[in-house]
């Protein structure tokens, strides 16, 4: 392979490091922050040079789709298969949860974190501390399987009357539903009807 410049080597080594530790490559923004480049176009330029020199392969149709080209120096890298899962922003009543207008971005998720059909999976960014006693923290990403039913004790994503998604523990009581926070300082939400849009099946947290 052709020789790399100092900056290209920094970027290449950073990509390898992230792949080794996380199982998937970093974003362009993360690469720039790691090597001190503020311009994403400059990072893209270096990635193009790395691709031309045969060190990486990229898929322009997918975010973060950077593949380390195997050679004698990196045969020991185990790059885990990833799926690109929609990250849902605003949830609109009457619109399927994964409708285009609800999707903010796609996130590369290690395949082992899902256990069902990929098309049924979406991600919500957690805001707030209502579920901290279940180990779900502000800023976490919850991995959700689309479904409209739930069993008592399930952690679900439900639609509020304000058309916002909320993550709570689900309970069906005699004449009402209870959405229970996992935070002893917060009160439960009682509803006559509840719109379940998914069950939390996993959690992803940036270290």
Swiss-Prot record:
Keywords: Autocatalytic cleavage, DNA damage, DNA repair, DNA replication, DNA-binding, Hydrolase, Repressor, SOS response, Transcription, Transcription regulation
A Gene Ontology biological process term: DNA repair
Site description Cleavage, residues in chain: 93-94
Major enzyme class: hydrolase
Record feature DNA-binding region, as residue ranges: 28-48
Transmembrane segments: none
Protein role: Represses a number of genes involved in the response to DNA damage (SOS response), including recA and lexA. In the presence of single-stranded DNA, RecA interacts with LexA causing an autocatalytic cleavage which disrupts the DNA-binding part of LexA, leading to derepression of the SOS regulon and eventually DNA repair.
PANTHER family, A to Z: LEXA REPRESSOR, LEXA REPRESSOR-RELATED
Family of the protein in this entry: Belongs to the peptidase S24 family.
Protein name per Swiss-Prot or TrEMBL: LexA repressor
Organism name: Staphylococcus aureus (strain NCTC 8325 / PS 47)
Upper classification of the organism: Bacteria, Bacillati, Bacillota, Bacilli, Bacillales
Name of the gene: lexA
């Amino acid at each position: 392979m052709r020789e790399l410049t100092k900056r290209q080597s920094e970027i290449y080594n950073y990509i390898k490091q992230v792949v080794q530790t996380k199982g998937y490559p970093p974003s362009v923004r993360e690469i720039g922050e790691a090597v001190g480049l503020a311009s994403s176009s400059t990072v893209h330029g270096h990635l193009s040079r790395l691709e031309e020199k045969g060190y990486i392969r990229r898929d322009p149709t997918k975010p973060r789709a950077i593949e380390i080209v195997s050679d004698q120096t990196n045969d020991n890298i185990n790059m885990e298969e990833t799926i690109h899962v929609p990250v849902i922003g605003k949830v609109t009543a009457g619109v399927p949860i994964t409708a285009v207008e609800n999707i903010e971005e796609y996130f590369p998720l290690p395949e082992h974190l899902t256990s069902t059909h990929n098309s049924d999976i979406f991600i919500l960014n957690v805001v707030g501390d209502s579920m901290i006693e279940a180990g779900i923290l502000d800023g976490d990403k919850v991995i959700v399987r689309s479904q409209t039913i739930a069993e008592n004790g399930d952690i679900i994503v439900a639609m509020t009357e304000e058309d916002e998604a909320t993550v709570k523990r689900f309970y069906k009581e005699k004449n009402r539903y209870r959405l229970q926070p996992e935070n002893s300082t917060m009160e439960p939400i009682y509803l006559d009807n509840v719109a379940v849009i998914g069950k939390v099946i996993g959690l992803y947290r940036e270290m």
